[in-house]
């Protein structure tokens, strides 16, 4: 099933586009009729890998994020969100999103919101780490983005947050079957990596 994205915002190249919440709600209902297992929403841009700290676009308004998640939950779906940026991720967590994919440039408030609301974070470090040395993007920017993400993963783990492995396979430099995500997460989480990731993966399985 394709992710759902707002018309004119990031995700249109891969997802199904809606123009307003009424149309989104109708699409969610259609997903239920077609036997979908969950809903994925696109609520922010992605990282500009040439400029540290920059996203290709801001996230959707918090009230919109809240409604998107509420509508899907009312239909009985778990919701995963492509989300970057502290305020966007915080809004999604406070609205009860089940998992956050990517989650670049988070701060303490966003991390606490995810932990307190039981959000599983799938940080997809390999989408950043695998860009190193390819020459496609600014190497200093890529290194800084990865360092920031790894620091946040370590902080979230220290809080007792739920972290699950996920590669975003099919993204540039992230081939199917790659184990680079595990290597990066193990680098961050150390000897506790297996226990932390098993706990997060079990929660993903329970939710989805």
What are these regions (language model features)?
Residues 1, 39-41, 79-81, 100-101, ...:
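Hydrophobic faces of well-ordered beta-strands that scaffold small-molecule active sites
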Residues 1-53, 57-71, 119-124:
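Divalent-metal coordination cores built from histidine and acidic residues
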Residues 5-6, 45-50, 84-90, 105-108, ...:
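Active-site environment of divalent metal-dependent phosphoester hydrolases
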Residues 57-62, 66, 92-105, 173-188:
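Short, electropositive alpha-helical surface patch
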Residues 68-80:
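Short beta-strand/loop segments at the ligand-binding rim of alpha/beta enzyme cores
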Residues 74, 137, 146-208:
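His/Asp/Glu-enriched, well-ordered alpha-helical/loop segment
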Residues 94-99, 115-121, 160-162, 189:
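Glycine-enriched alpha-helix->loop->beta-strand junction motifs that scaffold or abut catalytic
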């Amino acid at each position: 099933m394709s992710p759902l994205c707002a018309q004119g915002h990031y995700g249109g190249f891969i997802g199904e586009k809606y123009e307003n919440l009424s149309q989104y709600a109708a699409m969610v209902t259609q997903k239920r009729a077609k036997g979908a297992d969950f809903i994925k929403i696109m609520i922010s841009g992605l990282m500009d890998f040439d400029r540290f700290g920059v996203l290709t676009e801001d996230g959707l308004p918090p009230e919109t994020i809240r409604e998107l998640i509420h509508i899907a939950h009312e239909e009985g779906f778990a919701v995963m969100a492509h989300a970057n940026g502290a305020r966007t991720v915080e809004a999604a967590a406070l609205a009860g999103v089940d998992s956050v994919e990517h989650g670049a440039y988070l701060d303490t408030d966003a991390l606490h919101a995810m932990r307190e609301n039981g959000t599983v974070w799938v940080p997809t470090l390999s989408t950043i780490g695998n860009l190193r040395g390819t020459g496609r993007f600014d190497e200093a920017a890529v290194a800084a983005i990865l360092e920031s993400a790894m620091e946040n993963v370590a902080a979230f783990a220290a809080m007792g947050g739920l972290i699950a492995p996920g590669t975003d396979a099919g993204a540039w430099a992230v081939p199917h079957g790659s184990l680079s995500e595990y290597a990066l997460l193990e680098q961050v989480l150390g000897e506790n990596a297996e226990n932390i990731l098993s706990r997060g993966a079990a929660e993903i399985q329970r939710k989805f």
